[in-house]
Amino acid sequence: MPANNPFKTALAARQAQIGLWLSMATPYLAEVSATAGFDWLLIDGEHAPNDLRSTLHALQAVAPYPVQPVVRAVAGEVPLIKQLLDIGVRSLLVPMVDTAEQARMVVSATRYPPQGIRGVGSAIARASQWSARTDYLDVADDEVCLLVQAETVTALQNLEAICAVDGIDGVFIGPADLAASMGHRGRPGHPEVQAAIEGAMRTIIASGKAAGTLTSDPALARRYLDLGCTFVATGVDVMLYANAARKLAASFREQPSDAPAADKPSAAY
């Protein structure tokens, strides 16, 4: 069968993709989220307590649904990328890519030789349906949608070079880490940070690559989409639950909850 990755196809066509961030590390909630109507779900392996096995379980949980899973690795490590691709990850987000050299290494890790250095173990891999997909090795490289995160001042300085790397399908701006890198830790909504984010998005879009980010602020999400951002995560599962639970508990108390305001959006999470 030909290479098949609906998320990659949508990004290439610049069709806006609205996503939800999954940080609870449970396949049950991943499946619930798959029924919500989002275009994509981010299974987080960087800041959420996911490992290879829990990531596999999440992929299996959402597989019956049309929503597209994207997996964020804890780092752009070659052995880990090999394992993630083997368990069936087709859309991969790699954090903290600061240079074109790093971007090229990540691309190489997602390609089989001679184009790259990915180890060949497809016969025992979920990705090939355990060899039921007899043409898997022929189409595997084309099925990968590779996204890298630019989330430091250094990355923004090198953004044009990163975008120019062949094999990078999109660049995701990480607002929280970028804010910290700019000296505004915990304040991704700071005007200087927002100006940097919007400038970076324009650079990415001008390069022909897809731009993406995360924000729980609906107005800001729409602003990014209007700028031409293609893939935007608009909420985080654990925050949605925590805020709803706190609000419900507070509604039955005489005193307002001392917890953070549930309805206050964040430019980062």
Swiss-Prot record:
Gene3D superfamilies per the UniProt record, alphabetical: Phosphoenolpyruvate-binding domains (3.20.20.60)
Annotated site location: Increases basicity of active site His: D86
Stretch forming the signal peptide: none
One of the record's GO molecular function terms: metal ion binding
Site (Transition state stabilizer): R72
Active site: H47 (proton acceptor)
GO biological process: phenylacetate catabolic process
A GO CC term assigned to this protein in UniProt: cytoplasm
Superkingdom: Bacteria
Family named by the database record: Belongs to the HpcH/HpaI aldolase family.
General function of this protein: Aldolase which can catalyze in vitro the aldolisation reaction between hydroxypyruvate (HPA) or pyruvate (PA) and D-glyceraldehyde (D-GA). The condensation of hydroxypyruvate and D-glyceraldehyde produces 2-dehydro-D-gluconate as the major product, (3R,4S,5R)-3,4,5,6-tetrahydroxy-2-oxohexanoate and 2-dehydro-D-galactonate. The condensation of pyruvate and D-glyceraldehyde produces 2-dehydro-3-deoxy-L-galactonate as the major product and 2-dehydro-3-deoxy-D-gluconate.
Name of the featured protein: Hydroxypyruvate/pyruvate aldolase
Species of origin: Cupriavidus necator (strain ATCC 17699 / DSM 428 / KCTC 22496 / NCIMB 10442 / H16 / Stanier 337)
Lineage: Bacteria, Pseudomonadati, Pseudomonadota, Betaproteobacteria, Burkholderiales
